[in-house]
């Protein structure tokens, strides 16, 4: 079972931290490639309901694919079920449990197209900036793209500096992922 009250409380607390307490000093730490991941883990682990929420999402993804498998088998058991999934780190947030889904799928295919990932940076960044306009946009962008592993940090792949650098690319334009 799941502790829904703790899920509600802790996910709300994490949302409140992001919307009302997150500061530039937090963003600077989150923007660091390794240290940022530890900071994010610390924020999540200090709220056990967030981990429980992620477990719930994973269980729901397995239940959904199990139900699809049963529906397909009821009509034609020879039909294949091919599940599609975002790649990590998105699988953690979306709740996809590769091993659980694989039990009921004939294949699990990663979504390798990443054009829209940049829009996720823009969406999340705009939402946080709307809640906290005093945040440093450059630090926010660096934190988001670091946590989402969207740049190498090398001279050839330094990552963008503003939310405007992250949008759906034109067909002939390289995208920032």
What is the meaning of each model-derived region?
Residues 1-176:
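Polysaccharide-binding and catalytic clefts of secreted carbohydrate-active enzymes
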